[in-house]
């Protein structure tokens, strides 16, 4: 009699003689980190090096997507984010108190960054 495996479980895992078989992870993005900025904004320019470092440090993680919305394309950019990542949510992305506005969307939940726009603080906030 042949033994069958239950592949319906999301976390299906089977160990046999030092081999592990695991379902492939989905390509769905769990975390979106973004900023709305203006080229002429002094605060945006001051934050740019830390933002680039954040992207470099966290960009290696496959489940994180970075979004940058420039002031010239603000309405279109926010519409794309709202449609793609917040489609089922009542809350929609908007500019919060000026430039830069830094935000994250984790599993459809939107939150804004209100701390110091330095690498260490932004990194802590990303994983809260």
Give the ranges of each region predicted by the language model:
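Detector for methionine-enriched segments
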Residues: 1, 46-47, 78, 122
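Arg/Lys-rich, intrinsically disordered low-complexity tails that mediate electrostatic binding
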Residues: 1-27
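Local sequence-structure signature of Cys/Sec-based thiol-disulfide redox active-site neighborhoods
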Residues: 23-64
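Thioredoxin-like thiol-disulfide oxidoreductase module
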Residues: 60-127
């Amino acid at each position: 009699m042949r033994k069958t495996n239950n592949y319906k479980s999301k976390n299906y895992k089977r160990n046999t003689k030092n081999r592990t078989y695991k379902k492939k992870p989905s390509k769905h993005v769990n975390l979106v980190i973004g900023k709305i900025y203006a080229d002429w904004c002094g605060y945006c320019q001051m934050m740019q090096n830390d933002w680039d470092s954040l992207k470099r440090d966290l960009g290696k993680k496959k489940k994180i997507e970075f979004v940058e919305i420039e002031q010239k394309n603000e309405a279109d950019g926010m519409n794309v984010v709202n449609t793609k990542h917040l489609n089922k949510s009542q809350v929609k992305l908007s500019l919060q108190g000026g430039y830069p506005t830094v935000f994250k969307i984790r599993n459809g939940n939107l939150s804004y960054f209100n701390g110091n726009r330095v690498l260490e603080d932004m990194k802590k906030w990303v994983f809260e």
